[in-house]
Design a protein with these regions (language model features):
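N-terminal, polar/Ser/Thr-rich
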Residues: 18-62, 144-149, 169, 469-470
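Surface-exposed beta-strand/loop patches in extracellular or lumenal glycoproteins
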Residues: 64-83, 176-182, 454, 501-522
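A surface-exposed beta-strand-loop module
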Residues: 77, 81-143, 541-552
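Long, ordered, helix-rich scaffold segments
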Residues: 495, 511-513, 526, 533, ...
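Beta-strand-rich binding/interaction modules
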Residues: 85-92, 468-469, 479-559
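Extended, low-hydrophobicity, Ser/Thr/Pro/Gly-biased non-transmembrane segments
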Residues: 27-29, 33-35, 125-235, 513, ...
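Bacterial N-terminal signal peptides
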Residues: 6-15
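Hydrophobic alpha-helical and helix-loop surface patches within well-folded domains
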Residues: 207, 238, 244-510, 638-639, ...
């Protein structure tokens, strides 16, 4: 496998940083060292960038930047830049030689002799790369018309891959962009377009200077984009202003411009009211970006969304629509939390991401309460957060960071999913109106500036009259999470003792001290009004004294309302009742959490997978909540196909297939419920342990335009083809080739790439693994999409040979891929394994690589956890465990 030359360049940069004297200057190390950022933040102010770029070349963008700033005393100045080349450097009118000492391919050093006390101006001419992946300017080619579309993506520290700058969040700057592009192209950027000059073959676009923004938020897009503009008020009572949606010309007709523009502007208005600060960045445009590597990016004035998640090729489900709405609300919330007030350093990444997720949920609760938004919040956040926070690779919410080069490792469930859960606990602790007053004060204190988590807690603490220091120590700085076990004793139909015992999921990391938490304990009665008891958990064992003497409930649940943050393990009596009756609980949010509590017991290896599977198969035909049904189906398949060994799977596979087929064909259900069952059926049908005729059924569906009575559109057709390829169905190759001809769109080409990755043969796997690293034309989204197909659980023996190579490439992956890729890479490579031999390989690799960075080691440990649980569950329940047979003949 060939590793690209970036690793060599970084090594050269490190060597140059040491210099000819042999004395290492830590500031010049690759990346953006914290020591450099701290020094610059203390000395540099009033930064302005005037950035000019020429986008008329295929693979590179020549550019020039003028950097203006103030520095109170004469000392050297270091800019960050790791683009393709530097051709000229001028400082305050003085030409500087371009040498290895002035540009070490990571930083540009302006010597003190060229710097003034006070105002300074540095000009650099440079070249930035344009590529499908691994560049600051991403190129995506539309297969339908051959047109190229460009956009930038600079988070967390790729601004210095685009142009020389002070690439740290607490040196905000006013930015003016000037972009030359082909005449047929449009260009959008953070600022509003002010003028366009015409040349013979190009247009030169100039944009207004922005408000102060961090470098990672600078953005532009260029190409033959189509656009739709509407005049909308961005704040209640304000005059209407143009809001523009941009998309590829070939997809614009499919985009729901009216709906999406309204969704964005409604969010801007609601959040402006809630925060007490009107939208702070003037104009608002958003782009549906092709092949975008994640859900969205909050650039002020130019928000980018993932085109694939916003333009549907088949009828969307309610879950998809709610997910799209949540993404919009999340990115719009960032305009205040992240853009208007920004964390000082990426150790406080949670401050923007956690808040954006939490505010999106609060907004959904206010705008669309009928959608049960707190159920959505729980399902989208808590299981994912718990699944990471209970591992040996967990981190605190605040994550120490010595160099922005490692910032990508900080992205993941702790900041995106745990942090909003912690904020929900804080909101519950101080009260909603007090919480709002604190947040408004926080924003007023730091307009267009930077702040830390301590500033936030100080503002909320002042509003509430509480000292939140201990809260910060417990929930922001302490790694890990509590597991709360319920103990219930009764006599003569009355409770004699109800206690909550907590322990750390990872005592080595967290210590054994209890977490302090406010929660609500639910006593549930089928024939009476439930009893809710507020409880302050302050000790290892908390006695719920208010429950003594009350009638014994059907079940107890110690996190009613989802205000607490803990894995709750029900007592045995509650578990027994829930396994039989959880589907009868009417409150959808509570029902979702109860299923989660049962599933946590499976993952703790205290509840047999077969018992959960039996309960799920009895409940699914009656479940009418689309999101719960989807989550339950996913867990059912994990219980039977991953945690259940061959015997259990062989026994249950036909029942599961019939159950899913019946659900997909059930016209009494909503479209989304039926579609989720169909998708699950397609994705899980397998010949791994027994022949199944269901694959032939899937194959026949491709000859028509419906499946189980549902319309058969391109995404579902591709899912069927991928399954046929993965299972070596006789028609697989012919079906794949036919679908390639049928769907020649950009999305069709991506799906074909994914489908072929599923082939269970060594030659295909070798070809894909090499191409992931060696094909510079391969878009990162394509790689990410193909990982799960490549690492199919049923192909673990074939893919095990790539387990260690996948681990060996981690430093390269961290340097060259986007923020979420690292987690997806490890989740697929390690998560696609199920055997003890694979676990042994991971552990041996960790032992053999003590020099591995702590951040990468934690990422490996996070992914390892699911493999370790799989092995432990399979060992504890070699046949899946006991299960009820009372209802076994239902399907």
């Amino acid at each position: 496998m060939r590793i690209p030359t970036g690793a060599v360049l970084l090594a050269c940069a490190a060597a140059t940083a040491q210099g000819q004297t042999g004395v290492r200057d830590a500031r010049l190390a690759p990346g953006v060292p914290h020591v450099l950022a701290t020094q610059r933040a203390a000395n540099i102010s009033d930064v302005r960038y005037t950035l000019t770029l020429d986008l008329t070349h295929a693979d590179s963008a020549p550019g020039a930047v003028t950097v203006r700033f103030r520095q109170p005393r004469v000392q050297d100045v270091i800019l960050d830049f790791r683009g393709s080349g530097v051709s000229r450097i001028r400082a305050n009118g003085v030409e500087l030689p371009v040498t290895a000492s002035s540009w070490n391919r990571a930083h540009i050093r302006v010597p003190a002799s060229a710097v003034r006390a006070g105002e300074n101006e540095v000009q650099v001419m440079f070249t930035a790369p344009i590529a499908a992946a691994g560049a600051s300017i991403i190129r995506s080619r539309d297969a339908s018309d051959g047109q190229d579309y460009l956009y930038t993506l600079l988070v967390p520290s790729d601004a210095n891959l685009l142009f020389p700058c002070f690439d740290q969040p607490d040196l905000k700057a006013r930015v003016t962009l000037r972009i030359e592009a082909p005449r047929a192209w449009s260009v959008l950027a953070n600022g509003a377009a002010t003028r366009v000059d015409t040349t013979e073959r190009t247009l030169r676009h100039q944009f207004t200077e922005t408000q102060p923004i961090s470098t990672y938020l600078i953005a532009f897009a260029a190409g033959p984009y189509a656009k739709v503009s509407q005049r909308r008020a961005l704040a209640r009572g304000a005059a209407p202003t143009p809001v523009t949606m941009w998309a590829r010309a070939s997809r614009m007709k499919e985009a729901e411009a009216d709906s999406l523009i309204a969704m964005n502007t409604d969010a801007l208005q609601w959040l402006g009211d809630w925060f007490g600060v009107t939208y702070p960045f003037g104009k608002y445009d958003f782009l549906l970006a092709p092949a975008f590597p994640f859900g969205g990016m909050e650039h002020p004035g130019a928000v980018f969304y993932n085109e694939q998640s916003f333009i549907y090729r088949e009828r969307p489900t309610t879950s998809q629509l709610l997910g799209r709405q949540a993404t919009v609300f999340h990115e719009v919330a960032h305009q205040w939390f992240g853009d208007y007030v920004t964390m000082r350093w990426f150790d406080d990444l949670w401050l923007k991401e956690g808040f954006a997720t939490y505010m999106a949920a609060k907004m959904q609760a206010a705008i669309a309460p009928e959608s049960t938004p707190w159920k959505t919040f729980y399902l989208r956040n808590k299981p994912v957060a718990y699944g990471t926070d209970a591992t040996a690779g967990t981190t605190p919410v605040w994550q120490a960071l010595d160099n922005l080069e490692q910032a990508k490792s900080n992205y993941g469930p702790i900041v995106y999913n745990k942090a909003p859960g912690v904020l929900r606990q804080l909101d519950y602790l101080v009260g909603d109106s007090v919480f709002q007053r604190g947040i408004r004060a926080f924003l007023r204190e730091h307009p267009y500036g930077n702040a830390t988590w301590r500033d936030l807690l100080r503002a909320v603490g002042t509003a509430s009259g509480r000292d939140l220091t201990q809260f910060g120590q417990q929930w922001i700085l302490r790694p890990g999470m509590p597991i709360v076990s319920q103990q219930l004793r009764s006599a003569n139909g009355r409770i004699t003792r109800l206690a909550l015992t907590q322990r750390p999921a990872q005592p080595t990391l967290s210590g054994n001290a209890p977490w302090l938490m406010r929660t609500s304990v639910l006593l549930y009665y089928t024939d009476a009004t439930p009893v809710r008891i507020p409880v302050e958990i302050t000790k290892t064992v908390t006695e719920v004294t208010a429950a003594r003497g009350l009638r014994t409930p059907d079940f107890v649940f110690a996190n009613d309302g989802d205000y607490g943050y803990a894995i709750v393990l029900p007592d045995s009596a509650s578990t027994s009742w829930l396994l039989e009756h959880v589907g009868e609980v009417k409150d959808a949010t509570l029902r979702a959490m109860l299923w989660g509590a049962l599933w946590d017991q499976v993952r703790e290896a205290t509840l047999p997978p077969a018992s959960f599977a039996d309960a799920a198969m009895r409940a699914l035909p009656l479940e009418r909540d689309e999101q719960i049904a989807g989550a339950l189906t996913s867990r059912l398949l994990t219980a039977t196909q991953r945690y259940g060994r061959g015997g259990l799977r062989q026994t249950l596979q036909p029942r599961v297939e019939r159950l899913l087929l019946s659900g997909a064909a059930d016209t009494s259900r909503s479209y989304g419920q039926r579609k989720s069952q169909l998708d699950a059926l397609i994705g899980s049908t397998s010949n791994a342990f027994m022949p199944t005729r269901m694959l032939d059924t899937l194959d026949r569906w491709l000859d028509g335009d419906s499946a189980a009575g549902l319309p058969l559109r391109a995404p579902t057709r591709w899912a069927i083809v991928t399954r046929l390829v993965a299972e070596r169905h006789p028609s697989a190759n012919a079906r794949l080739q036919a679908e390639v001809v049928r769907d020649s769109s950009s999305e069709g080409k991506r799906q074909a790439f994914v489908a072929a990755a599923a082939a269970p043969d060594s030659a295909t796997k070798a070809r894909y693994f090499a191409r992931w690293f060696n094909d510079s034309t391969l878009n990162e989204e394509w790689v990410t999409s193909s990982l799960r197909a490549f690492h199919d659980d049923d192909q673990d023996v074939i893919t095990r040979r790539y387990l260690v190579p996948s681990l060996d490439t981690l430093p390269w992956v961290q340097r060259n891929r986007r923020i979420f890729f690292l987690g997806a890479w490890l989740s697929a490579a390690i998560g696609g394994q199920v055997a003890p031999e694979a676990l042994a390989q991971v552990d041996a690799w960790l032992a053999a690589n003590p020099q591995l960075g702590a951040d990468l080691r934690r990422k490996v440990l996070q992914a390892r956890d699911e493999l370790e649980r799989t092995v432990r569950i399979r060992t504890a329940y070699p046949t899946g465990g006991p299960r009820s047979t009372v209802h076994s003949d239902r399907f």
